[in-house]
Structures are given as C-alpha cells and as structure tokens.
Amino acid sequence: MYSISFAPLQGYTEDVYRRIHQDVFGGVDTYYTPFVRLEHGEVRSKDMRDVRPEFNQGVNVIPQVIANGGNELQQLVDKLTGLNYKRIDINMGCPFPLQTRHGRGAGLLPDVEAVKEIVGVMKENLGVEFSVKMRLGLEDENEWKEIIPLLNNVPLNHITVHPRIATQQYKGEVKMSAFDELLEACQHEVIFNGDITSVDDIKRIEDTYGDKLQGIMIGRGMLGRPSLAMEYKSGKQMADAEVVRRLKVMHDRMWQHYEQIIPGEAQRLAKIRTFWDYTEAILGRKAWKKVMKAGNLKNYLKAVQEL
C-alpha cells in the first residue's frame, strides 16, 4: 500500500485545515505546508506562522520552501531548523508566473547553475533530510534530464514528480512516457503527483508501477473529496452523504477558528468560501452554486446548513 501525502495548496491547506482534516477524515501519512518564501529579502512572517510547531501538534507536517538559488534556500533552511524541523521539501514545480519569472518553482528547471547551488546547500546541511517536488520542465518536458543527475548526487528522502511542464499549469494530458523515462533515470524514491481524484486513480497507478513508487501525493482531488486517503487505506468507499456531513463538520470548525482571528464579516466570508472551491462534484452543481453565489453571510450559512 502506498503512502499518501496531501499536497501543499496555497490558500487552502494551511495549519487549521490540516489539523481538522486529520481529525475528521484522516488517512494521510504526510501533510506538506504551502511553500515558505522570502519577500523583500526576509522570510514571510505569515508563512512562518503556518509552520510553527504549536499550530501543527499531532500532525505529520513537512514544510515546503521555494527559492531561486542557494542564498535564498539557506535563509529558509536556517529559519526552519531554528524551529527544530529536520525535514524540508524544496519546490521545483510551482507553475505560476509570479514565481517562475523570478527563477523559483519550475523556473529553476532550465537554470542548471541555480540547481547546482541548491544541491550545494543540501550537501552543506547534513542534519536536514531534504526532498524535492518538481515538474518535467518549465517549457520543455526534457529539462528534467539535466536536473535529475544533479539530484542523484545528493541524499534525498524522495522526489515527487508532477508529469507536466509548468506552462500547462494543470491543463492538458500528463506526460506519462516522460515520467517513465524520469523514473528509470532517478536513483531516489519517487512519489507520483497529478490528476488523482479517486481511489480508482490511485489503484491504476499502483497496478502500473507497484513498488517502483514510494507513494502518491494528492492535492485538488483531496480538496474535492477529503475522504480519498481514508477510503484508499480502509478499502471502503464512504457514502457521498457521509462525506458531505463530514465536510460540514470540517467547515463549521474552520468557521469557528476564523471567527476568532479574522476581523470583519466580509473578510471571513471571503476566506471560508474557498473551502468549497473544488467540491462541486460531491455537492451537486445546484447546491454548490447556492453556496458559492450567496451574497451575504446569512444566506451563505443557510446554504451550507441545507447541504
């Protein structure tokens, strides 16, 4: 049976979501934080709050970082090791231009010299166990061919691969033939990521690759059906009505949390509504639209109650 990781998703899988998901659904072996990054030369305080140990107690959390080279990475490593983290994941896969145009995320993949710097930092920090999340390339699905040999020369826990190029973002087909080629070339454990939305999808990967893979990382598919990891681990499908019931439990606990920390009704509503972004399939279009289109807090909470 594969290990199941919950992918880091900016704006969704913050500390409160991770804690409550584990309590209400479970089945996830490892949760990754949305990437910690520098802003104006300093580590973002918002990102550091999300990884603080007191907000992640009882949850197996690995912080992810995003950097454009060795100097940025070392700053981030210093901050996280200061919080006693021994595992750090490095993002070489973020497809969004806000990061890639600054040489971060998948923007690293065509920049062999920057990756060499990152490898150097990993070698210098032997007390940290690193992993990497990457795509096949920024604009070319062959860019990984210069990167994997560099990563083969440094100890890594694993490499997570999303077999698309960054310019696809999440559209188009995953490039499985290129993934197969990468898998053969990689000397580390590999985790598969991309387009996993059902237990059948997990089993299809499992049947194809068996013990060639360490596990599966799921992102948007888990936001849409948070029972997915538990269903795979237990071998039992949860009834849709029970998934929705537990979604409402999750939602209500998150809402209570936001009431305490977010001033202003409009701000709280804008924040909590994103909880439902990927749930149209499980809720049904009519009910989902009612939640997403509610114009004020009273109508929103009524729409949620009626789910």
Identify the role of each PLM range.
Residues 1-307:
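Flavin-dependent oxidoreductase catalytic cores
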